[in-house]
């Protein structure tokens, strides 16, 4: 039995799609030195190669892929988008505007200089910025621009071609820039990180090990009674002195949860909760030969929960003002926009921040009710909310505007992005609404992106050989310029106009480029996760601005003559 693989793939779009995805994901695991190719590049390369052999895919699959991707980007950005935009993000907003705006203007200038069409120019901008949202926004606006079908087909092919030719250039150049640009300026990144840490009281030990609190029980002897000197628990401030707090007391066989007015007496049995190192540092009067093992006394359910900041009495307050330890709770992590932040008493809490807190289940529940809610650990996605907001996004995208003889629509990309932001924002404020497990969100986002990249490559593959010969050298130059010059402009603006701390500035620059690999290099250079504060500040805004840049470049292009 003979099987013609080419005919088999051409006759089955679904089979072709998953063959491209599987081969591309395998290729993406390869490394060039310390740089991994990545899934996007792997799928793009494989799809380009198969596209050269005249394999093609249904455009509906491509459209669905980018719709899912851009919607999920909005859902991720939603919890912090409005707080950054309206309150704390003036510097971060300005940095993102400078980065995206300068890249847009440079791309427009180079496109006119080299005589390219809008497809090549927008594709070059998207690839150089390693930004799929630019590609998505430009492609969607082109489809709704009302230009002739033959011109539209050529522009969309060139859009994919420009992106394919410059993506790797943009990625590698930014990674190299992230490694060497900090060394070209006069301030050491590690020193800058330490400086901001001292100013804000940050915990600079980013690699500290996080332990869960444990419970141990001790019998009160004469030494401990003498140590307390008749003071009640509130006056003693045991947590401040030992790092542990008294959760339970057994007195005369009666088990009770003490309040601040309780005074320790001879023969009491007390249950102390604290980190292992805090137990090890206890004064000998607590533990020398007096530890007890009592099932009832030690029967406590220590839990670790992720608490989402929501309530108005917590939003805008500093972490220290929550006084978690006074309520018998221990803070393990602070997460903002999927980025782990330094545990900093002076960090101002934003709506949607996630605090990982450990302690007795009842105490954790109490503190969660006070500052927000416990993140739902269900693995069930609220598909109704997902579908409803997806529909809303598509309806927003149908809105069109007419200017003289030129019409353009908001487009599916911008509409879905806005709808996703609203879903993410509402989810951060309403615990029972719109829940999407992070794993499910990542899977849908990644799958949508990979489907889109496969469609882009198969569409552009047939013309890539001619494109390389005609504009390959120009694309190389333009890709480097658009990738690096906006970074330099952004650095100069942040350093000398905004006068930002360099560790925060470099983190914010990488956030404005939405490039996680480059962010890791900056953190390694600073030997701190302080730059993550800046990265989180610009990342959500930049995702939105980059999508709008893809739309704007198509709208502006006809007016340049």
Swiss-Prot record:
Its chief place of residence is membrane
Database matches in Gene3D superfamilies = Regulator of K+ conductance, C-terminal domain (3.30.70.1450)
Q: Name one GO cellular component term.
A: plasma membrane
Enumerate the PROSITE patterns for this protein: RCK_C
Which superkingdom does the taxonomy of this entry point to?
A: Bacteria
Q: Does the keyword Cell membrane apply?
A: yes
Domain RCK C-terminal stretches: 200-288, 292-373
Q: Note whether Cell cycle occurs among the keywords.
A: no
Q: How does the UniProt record describe the way this protein sits in the membrane?
A: Multi-pass membrane protein
Q: What Pfam families does its record include?
A: Asp-Al_Ex, TrkA_C
One of the protein's GO biological processes: potassium ion transport
Transmembrane region(s): 8-28, 32-52, 66-86, 94-114, 158-178, 383-403, 406-426, 447-467, 475-495, 540-560
What subcellular locations does the record give?
Cell membrane
Q: Which UniProt keywords apply?
A: Cell membrane, Membrane, Repeat, Transmembrane, Transmembrane helix, Transport
List GO molecular-function terms, semicolon-separated.
monoatomic cation transmembrane transporter activity
Q: Give the record's family classification.
A: Belongs to the AAE transporter (TC 2.A.81) family. YbjL subfamily.
Q: What is this protein called?
A: Putative transport protein YbjL
Origin species: Salmonella typhi
Tell me the name of the encoding gene: ybjL
